Amino acid sequence: MKQTRSPLYPIFLFVIINLIIFTLSRLGLAIWQADRVSAVAGWGQLFLQGLRMDIVALCYLFGVPALFTVLFHNSRIWKMILRIWLTLGSVFILFMELATPAFIETYDFRPNRLFIEYLIYPKEVFSMLMEGHLTAVIFSLIFTVVAFFCYWKLSGYAVRNLRPMSWKWRPVVALLVIAVAFLGARSSFQHRGVNPAMVAFSSDGLVNSLVLNSGYSVLYAAQQFKDEGASSEAYGKMDTDEMLRIVKASRGR
């Protein structure tokens, strides 16, 4: 069979699929919360900024594999790694969107740092889910498992018949991929890249959270946790009794 597909075909295919999933999920959530979206006249901003944040998320997720695909698309080992990356990344995106309605119903927000914090107490969370969202949990798990096999099969189709690229062009295309992924992930020419605060446009926290996608929201929260942990190390540790003694001494007690 002729090798007619661009080496980046698998990346483009999965980017388009996940953009569709993001958009359909956001549309469904917006229709569900239509009164609140309309109350802040947020329909246009919601989908415009939402598309922006989806592109940011996909550039972070698929930027690195796009680069390596340009360089090693003829390698069987890399094709297997790429299939795993495309499949697991897409399953994560789908699972987080499926988990979103139940989370919003409980916390009035997309999955965020609370999603991570409650993972520390899996028994309590599992009990709560079984009592209040059993149907949603079963549906999400079944759909996620089915999606895994579908994505895996689709990734196998996507990496077939890729057209070889001359080595003299690979560095050039690789630089273009780096530039596009970097600019897409930052989505801003300011000193700092885009973040949730930059795309918030209303006083309604839920509507602002709908601009994001749930995978990005959770991973951004995880990064904040990491940064908080790193910053706390600068202050060292102190025994509670010693801390109280110093405070009392400073107040003359």
Question: Model-found features: residue ranges?
Answer:
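Transmembrane and membrane-interface helices of multi-pass
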Residues: 2-227
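Membrane/wall-proximal cationic-aromatic binding patches
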Residues: 211-253
